[in-house]
Amino acid sequence: MAALSSGSSAEGASLFNGDMEPEPPPPVLGACYAGSGGGDPAIPEEVWNIKQMIKLTQEHIEALLDKFGGEHNPPSIYLEAYEEYTSKLDALQQREQQLLESMGNGTDFSVSSSASTDTVASSSSSSLSVAPSSLSVYQNPTDMSRNNPKSPQKPIVRVFLPNKQRTVVPARCGVTVRDSLKKALMMRGLIPECCAVYRIQDGEKKPIGWDTDISWLTGEELHVEVLENVPLTTHNFVRKTFFTLAFCDFCRKLLFQGFRCQTCGYKFHQRCSTEVPLMCVNYDQLDLLFVSKFFEHHPISQEETTLGETTPASGSYPSVPPSDSVGPPILPSPSPSKSIPIPQPFRPADEDHRNQFGQRDRSSSAPNVHINTIEPVNIDDLIRDQGVRGEGGSTAGLSATPPASLPGSLTNVKALQKSPGPQRERKSSSSSEDRNRMKTLGRRDSSDDWEIPDGQITVGQRIGSGSFGTVYKGKWHGDVAVKMLNVTAPTPQQLQAFKNEVGVLRKTRHVNILLFMGYSTKPQLAIVTQWCEGSSLYHHLHIIETKFEMIKLIDIARQTAQGMDYLHAKSIIHRDLKSNNIFLHEDLTVKIGDFGLATVKSRWSGSHQFEQLSGSILWMAPEVIRMQDKNPYSFQSDVYAFGIVLYELMTGQLPYSNINNRDQIIFMVGRGYLSPDLSKVRSNCPKAMKRLMAECLKKKRDERPLFPQILASIELLARSLPKIHRSASEPSLNRAGFQTEDFSLYACASPKTPIQAGGYGGFPVH
């Protein structure tokens, strides 16, 4: 540390006293200071000296970064020097700010700031060998008292925005250009990522980074320009009355009469017109532009995409930055152009390396819905936030107790057995008949009644295997699907959690959900559902490549959204929604299946339950891949998976088909660098469906819509599509199915009209 400080001090002394003599203040800076306070002429000189000290300190920090920045584990002496220089830089910047404010106020500042000046001077002399006189106070209090106080002049930066607009932002220390201009750009429908910022130097525009400190640009003029290959258009608003369920894109409230842009589809109330973005931005092409630029400047090496063979005992994952961050994580640095890259490879846990990316599990007809215990009020709160007023009865009694709190909790088990039915029966008469009927109802409502004894199910051929079990075709009062779960010798806690989740599954009844018929615990845990004769949506789209019409594809999406809306209304999170788990009957009726319970999908340690990565990576939301939260699965994670299903429907192919590396997909999607390419959708795909797909695939979880709003949008789209009706002039006999030979049996000559004059030529006239 001493050697490093002495070397830095020698370099600083040579910069100030040797080869690089500090230049006098520039005329612009001196004129600005002279006109601001009119005080002692030594003040601008001191400010100039402090600026030179700041510049010198930054050069030392940059030298340290160039020397040790590329090392994963830099020496401790480097970290100590780094902290010392950054703290010194903060002190110098604070002193500069005090001088500028004092010059603007025209008040006495030498006494109040002498302590800070001495501190800066002493710290500078200890490490940089700079004379304390360079930071000494030259101001005479009596001279300042003779000047009349003037209003302070705040440091500002003038900014010229696109479309001949301009604004002024304050030049605050420690605030980046991005943060200073973010609000002004958002009000104009722009984001920093689609623009470039320039500064004017010597009559030429020179680009600067968005992370540059705005205080370094005090008094300058910045120009913000839209990137060349970012498509921007103006809105095309029309007044519209929405006779079907619609929501304002700004306030998310119900919309009946308002306006709609014919280009981008933005709809809003008249009172929300002031908040509408001024430009139409094609965010789909914008995402593609960012991804292409990222691959150009940030190639992914093999080391970054390598999966770890083992996982930590805690089940946690390495930290991954949020999806809206760009670039690898870096140490904070005061220099905008230097950073310390610290590569952190993303290593998901418990991956089976034997399964290659190209090998996919066969579809099974067993449902795979995770019962994630969410309070009934949460779905209402989320729907209210999205502007949807949900209706329906309370779901009390349908929510299971959180699996993590189940073991050893007798009160939780009792609370689960409470339901509105038995409570009403207890209020009835105490006669023996009522009591017997109450017992009958209670027996029928208990989860034990859904347990199928061992030996009643005849297990047939093996259909396929999934991530957490194997599916067989069986016989139990008809054809059923039996999914044997991969749980051997379950503990009492696991068994109780499994029964609690079954208590919720047994109450699911919907036309678009596979019917749950029962479960068994011997010889192993298994769930029994109805048998589906049709094939999965994955089989139709990617195996036999069935060519569906657009109206059929939209109807499949509508039924899927309808089934998911029902599950979410029951506080059930699917967790593994994908085209393999969506089944189509011969009449194209959608059935959502593949229930994989939380008891099976979670990792148990003793009596405690931990979440683990489950499902197929192509349908996983970024927050699920990162696994930073204790329970990343939510209604919005199902919405993201539904967005991938929409992508399959509208393109006929899987996302990221151009990337063959499974680990690279996990890495890129988890960090928010990769999104499905929406430019591959079919040419006849409606714009509303494409917008809905983009909203469902938002990288930020809270920005995705919920299924009530999704279902309303798809139903509106389905009703708006043109339909070809049967011609009214078609012969009714052909519609009845008669053939040509049916008429030949009754063939007869058709009468002809007489054509002779008068019409009576064939008859004698008397």
From Swiss-Prot:
* This protein's GO CC annotations: cytoplasm; cytosol; mitochondrion; nucleus; plasma membrane
**Where are the annotated Phorbol-ester/DAG-type zinc-finger regions?**
234-280
Q: Which residues bind Zn(2+) 2?
A: 248, 251, 269, 272
Annotated compartments: Nucleus; Cytoplasm; Cell membrane
Per UniProt, the ranges with Polar residues bias are: 303-313
Output compositional bias ranges, type Basic and acidic residues: 348-363, 423-447
Compositional bias per record (Low complexity), positions renumbered to this chain = 1-15, 110-128, 314-328
The annotation note on the cofactor reads:
Binds 2 Zn(2+) ions per subunit.
Q: Which UniProt keywords apply?
A: Allosteric enzyme, ATP-binding, Cell membrane, Cytoplasm, Kinase, Membrane, Metal-binding, Nucleotide-binding, Nucleus, Phosphoprotein, Proto-oncogene, Serine/threonine-protein kinase, Transferase, Zinc, Zinc-finger
Cofactor(s) demanded: Zn(2+)
What GO terms describe the biological role, i.e. biological process, of this protein? MAPK cascade
Which annotated residues bind ATP? Answer: 463-471, 483
Q: List, alphabetically, the InterPro entries matched.
A: C1-like_sf, DAG/PE-bd, Kinase-like_dom_sf, PE/DAG-bd, Prot_kinase_dom, Protein_kinase_ATP_BS, RBD_dom, Ser-Thr/Tyr_kinase_cat_dom
Phosphothreonine sites (modified residues) = 753
**Notes on how activity is controlled:** In quiescent cells, maintained in an inactive state via an intramolecular interaction between the protein kinase and N-terminal domains. Following mitogen-mediated cell activation, binds via its RGB domain to active HRAS (GTP-bound) which releases the inhibitory intramolecular interaction between the two domains. This allows the MAP2K1-mediated dimerization of KSR1 or KSR2, and BRAF which activates BRAF.
The molecular function terms of the Gene Ontology recorded here are:
ATP binding; MAP kinase kinase kinase activity; protein serine kinase activity; zinc ion binding
Q: Which PANTHER family match?
A: SERINE/THREONINE-PROTEIN KINASE TNNI3K-RELATED, SERINE_THREONINE-PROTEIN KINASE B-RAF
What role does this protein play?
A: Protein kinase involved in the activation of the MAP signaling cascade. May play a role in transducing specific signals in neural cells.
The Swiss-Prot or TrEMBL record describes its family as follows: Belongs to the protein kinase superfamily. TKL Ser/Thr protein kinase family. RAF subfamily.
Name of the protein: Serine/threonine-protein kinase B-raf
| Organism name | Gallus gallus (Chicken)
Lineage of the species this protein comes from = Eukaryota, Metazoa, Chordata, Craniata, Vertebrata
